[in-house]
Amino acid sequence: MFAVAVRASQIPHLTRLNRRMHASADPEKIGMTLKQLATLASLRDRGELPQQSLCDVLRTSQNTVVMWLNELEELGFISRVRDADDRRKHNVAITPAGTAALERGELEMRRLEDEVLAGLTADERAQLRKLLAKALQEPG
């Protein structure tokens, strides 16, 4: 019975697909790590954010996000400024250099995605993207 349930589940397939993408995602080719790419994409999509809000968006601890932001700031991809209303807080924004690096990284990720999903037609890839986005939506 358990073997049938495992075969019926799509989770192992999604896990294997995720591992293939990560194995193919060479930071040298992308120009940054996948974590950095996700951070920049979040800032581009949402605009300037308080650092704590970015932690919530990325579902990652404050300490980890600070480490990522330090790396991105050193690269010139983000800027941190003190919140005008609460000087203890920092807001984070993507810089023009960060936007350019993100665009290059996303282009490489699309190329990798095409390689990993080569067995699917363009319509099937579009459907997969749509279904995955729907599955990842927050409830409510």
Each predicted region: which residue ranges?
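C-terminal regulatory/oligomerization modules of transcriptional regulators
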Residues: 1-5, 123-140
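N-terminal helix-turn-helix DNA-binding core of bacterial DNA-binding proteins
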Residues: 19-64, 75
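N-terminal leader segment of winged-helix/HTH proteins
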Residues: 1-31
